[in-house]
């Protein structure tokens, strides 16, 4: 496994980009407005964001969406289970705005914006290797657990968040409950063993994706405005033709929040250079290989959209090798972003399995 699951990377020197207080205040007000209007039946008291300071890279914090903070602070968390959900690349916890209200009331739900993404701190970190890059995100999840005094929790993750979630569970199995849920995870299959993570893309989508990923790998870090406002936006939109059932009002506020993510200081978008092989989204360290080397003593539940462009083949192949020990669900008539597109079906699977 390259050793990184059992070694601690040296923390980089302390430096964080300053964030404009006025921009931060405006962003947080928009988030509160959205939660108040569109996360019914939850209220702002029940579901809200909080900046959680973590002991990493100086004065860093994770901007974290929490349902049930009052229970979290009570002894034994008021006998409730804890679920931490990790978002994917260039996203934020808001991808779960429809899912959170549908999760069983048995759970306290915690959804951090990953370090360097969303409205979390923007540290200046120079990525140098795949191991070090993965470790940055995994260690920040662990720092969050420590700060919130959580002894054990269930972990879920969407897309790249699923990749980090599983690696976290392999590195810190003592803190993770016996079930892990991965939402359309990236980085599963080893293409040398069969399967292709672009199998479900149309020809036009493949051309666009290859072009976009190729450009991302050649642009310099100084071209932040180009990569953020055009290249990354184009990649996210062209990944698939999802038909989100979002109202115009919801979309307007979400669009404003998204644009504010791009107005924040430089983020950690360059992590993909060390996680994926150029130019296609094939992992440098496939989870298929990592799991084969060290089979987690956990039940893993995989959930994909029927038209998902993530590699379902690696999951099927892995499951066959391990005697079909993992659960595997396909949500019909949706793509990669089913937490927005087919949230009722996804919530049902989660509630039945955890």
Question: Where do the PLM segments sit?
Answer:
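Conserved HGGG/HGGXW glycine-rich cap/lid loop of the alpha/beta-hydrolase fold
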Residues: 60, 65-123, 158-160, 171
């Amino acid at each position: 496994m390259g050793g990184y699951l059992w070694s601690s990377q040296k923390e980089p020197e302390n430096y964080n980009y300053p964030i404009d207080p006025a921009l931060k205040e405006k962003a947080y007000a928009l988030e509160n407005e959205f939660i108040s209007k569109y996360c019914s039946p939850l209220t702002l008291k029940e579901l809200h964001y909080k900046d959680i300071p973590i002991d990493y890279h100086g004065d860093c914090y994770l901007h974290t969406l929490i349902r049930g903070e009052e229970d979290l602070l009570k002894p034994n968390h008021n006998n409730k289970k804890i679920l931490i959900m990790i978002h994917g690349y260039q996203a934020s916890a808001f991808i779960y705005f429809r899912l959170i209200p549908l999760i069983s009331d048995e759970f306290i739900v915690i959804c951090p914006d990953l370090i360097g993404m969303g409205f979390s701190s923007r540290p200046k970190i120079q990525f140098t290797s795949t191991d070090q890059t993965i470790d940055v995100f995994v260690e920040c999840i662990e720092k969050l657990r420590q700060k919130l005094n959580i002894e054990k929790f269930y972990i879920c993750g969407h897309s790249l968040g699923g990749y980090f979630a599983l690696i976290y569970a392999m590195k810190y199995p003592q803190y993770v409950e016996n079930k892990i849920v991965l939402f359309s995870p990236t980085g599963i299959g080893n293409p040398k063993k069969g399967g292709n993570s672009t199998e479900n893309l149309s020809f036009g989508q493949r051309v666009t994706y290859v072009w976009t990923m190729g450009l991302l790998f050649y642009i310099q870090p100084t071209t932040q405005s180009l990569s953020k406002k055009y290249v990354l936006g184009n990649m996210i939109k062209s990944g698939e033709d999802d038909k989100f059932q979002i109202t115009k009002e919801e979309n307007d506020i979400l669009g404003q929040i998204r644009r504010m993510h791009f107005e924040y200081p430089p983020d950690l978008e360059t992590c993909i250079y060390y996680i994926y092989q150029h130019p296609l989204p094939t992992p440098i360290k496939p989870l298929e290989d990592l799991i084969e080397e060290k089979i987690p003593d956990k039940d893993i539940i995989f959930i994909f959209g029927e038209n998902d462009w993530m590699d379902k083949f690696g999951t099927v192949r892995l499951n066959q090798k391990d005697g079909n020990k993992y659960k595997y669900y396909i949500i019909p008539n949706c793509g990669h972003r089913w937490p927005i597109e087919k949230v009722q079906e996804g919530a049902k699977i989660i509630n039945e399995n955890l």
